[in-house]
């Protein structure tokens, strides 16, 4: 059976990025625990492909068909992934505008039932509910399955843009284990013997 794919999506628009480090750590642990492949998409890399002022055809990139191939490939990777880890830095009390634009280009039916793990980074604990009040409703629109456990991290939880506190590392480990267990159950349902059991 083909291994499941985990795609990490980080809404950072600068590098180095604590958000990217967090998303990457979660996705890597999930992949290791579940035997999945994983890929990291950072907005700092694909943003120029999602926001070209004018593309080769002279059309603004408000529709995916007008995007360069690299931009379309990022969206298709999200749509075809078996599971997604989504993280954002907090800007003005919400997720980054670049992250919202990316998901505005995702097909409304592409994430139905897809497992999604949410995380965010911020400079103050006052934004601690951003995963619940901002990110979860966004993926509720897509009818995705968002993991009950989310991760919120502060700048002080990192050292040199890498996870620096044991408490955050423990939360990442717990969330990754829960997500991997969910993926393993999904993989089991896709095995031929599972299908025969319900025939």
Question: Where do the PLM segments sit?
Answer:
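N-terminal beta1-alpha1-beta2 submodule of the flavodoxin-like/Rossmannoid cofactor-binding fold
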Residues: 1-88, 93-100, 170-173, 181, ...
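Residues on a specific face of well-ordered alpha-helices
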Residues: 24, 28, 97, 133-137, ...
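Mobile beta-alpha loop/short-helix "lid" or hinge segments that flank ligand
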Residues: 41-53, 141-159
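Glycine-rich phosphate/pyrophosphate-binding loop and the adjoining helix
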Residues: 146-199
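Helix-loop-strand module that forms the ligand-binding subsite of alpha/beta enzymes
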Residues: 66-142
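Short, histidine-centered active-site or binding-site loop motifs used for metal coordination
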Residues: 10-12, 120-122, 155
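A short small-residue
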Residues: 3-8, 115, 152-160
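A general structural signal for alpha-helical elements within enzymatic catalytic domains
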Residues: 28-31, 107, 140, 184
């Amino acid at each position: 059976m083909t291994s499941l794919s985990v795609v990490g999506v980080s809404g950072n628009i600068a590098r180095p990025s604590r958000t990217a480090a967090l998303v990457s750590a979660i996705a890597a642990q999930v992949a290791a625990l579940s035997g999945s492949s994983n890929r990291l998409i950072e907005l700092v890399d694909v943003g120029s492909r999602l926001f070209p002022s004018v593309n080769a055809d002279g059309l603004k990139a408000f529709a995916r068909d007008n995007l360069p191939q690299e931009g379309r490939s990022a969206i298709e990777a999200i749509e075809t992934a078996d599971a997604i880890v989504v993280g954002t830095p907090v800007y003005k009390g919400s997720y980054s505008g670049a992250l919202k634009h990316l998901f505005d280009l995702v097909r409304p039916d592409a994430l139905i039932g897809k497992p999604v793990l949410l995380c965010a980074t911020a400079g103050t604990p006052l934004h601690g509910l951003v995963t619940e009040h901002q990110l979860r409703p966004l993926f509720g629109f897509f009818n995705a399955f968002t993991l009950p456990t989310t991760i919120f991290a502060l700048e002080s939880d990192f050292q040199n843009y890498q996870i620096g506190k044991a408490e955050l590392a423990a939360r990442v480990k717990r969330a990754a284990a829960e997500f991997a267990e969910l993926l393993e159950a999904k993989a089991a349902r896709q095995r031929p013997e599972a299908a025969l059991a319900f025939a």
